[in-house]
């Protein structure tokens, strides 16, 4: 049964994705439908988690907008994502960066990999 599921979902997986990890800063180009129009909206922030595998893999990006933390979870292989740009590579020692939710200002910075 599992082989059948992987065979069906294999054709729906995206292959043009950049490699990214928690701690990296991304710019996600999301297709947004407003009425009859479709436009691209940018969401830029730090990856705080990545979970799952295969077609159900998701990642969460966190940014601070007007002093309020905003987190958005995206499926990796959704057709709603037009493009993913990796802006910075972050050096972290955790897979889930939930501790960033409690940090403010300069303490919430992540070291960059040179």
Swiss-Prot record:
Alphabetical list of Gene3D superfamilies matching this protein: 2.30.30.790
Keywords of the record: Ribonucleoprotein, Ribosomal protein
Residue pairs linked by disulfide bridges in the UniProt entry: none
Highest rank taxon of the organism: Bacteria
N-terminal signal peptide: none
GO cellular component term, pick one: cytosolic large ribosomal subunit
Any single GO BP term: translation
GO MF term set: structural constituent of ribosome
Pfam families for this protein: Ribosomal_L19
InterPro entries assigned: Ribosomal_bL19, Ribosomal_bL19_CS, Ribosomal_bL19_sf, Translation_prot_SH3-like_sf
Homology family: Belongs to the bacterial ribosomal protein bL19 family.
PANTHER family: LARGE RIBOSOMAL SUBUNIT PROTEIN BL19M, RIBOSOMAL PROTEIN L19
Function: This protein is located at the 30S-50S ribosomal subunit interface and may play a role in the structure and function of the aminoacyl-tRNA binding site.
Name of the protein: Large ribosomal subunit protein bL19
The species this protein was found in: Bacillus mycoides (strain KBAB4)
Encoding gene (name): rplS
């Amino acid at each position: 049964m599992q082989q059948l599921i992987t065979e069906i979902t294999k054709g729906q997986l995206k292959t043009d994705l950049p490699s990214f990890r928690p701690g990296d800063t991304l710019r996600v180009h999301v297709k947004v439908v407003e009425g009859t129009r479709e436009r691209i909206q940018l969401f830029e922030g730090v990856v705080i988690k990545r979970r799952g595998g295969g077609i159900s893999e998701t990642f969460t990006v966190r940014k601070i907008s007007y002093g309020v933390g905003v987190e958005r979870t995206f499926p990796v292989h959704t057709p709603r994502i037009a493009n993913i740009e990796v802006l910075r590579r972050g050096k972290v020692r955790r897979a889930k960066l939930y501790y960033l939710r409690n940090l403010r200002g300069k303490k919430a910075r992540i070291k960059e990999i040179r």
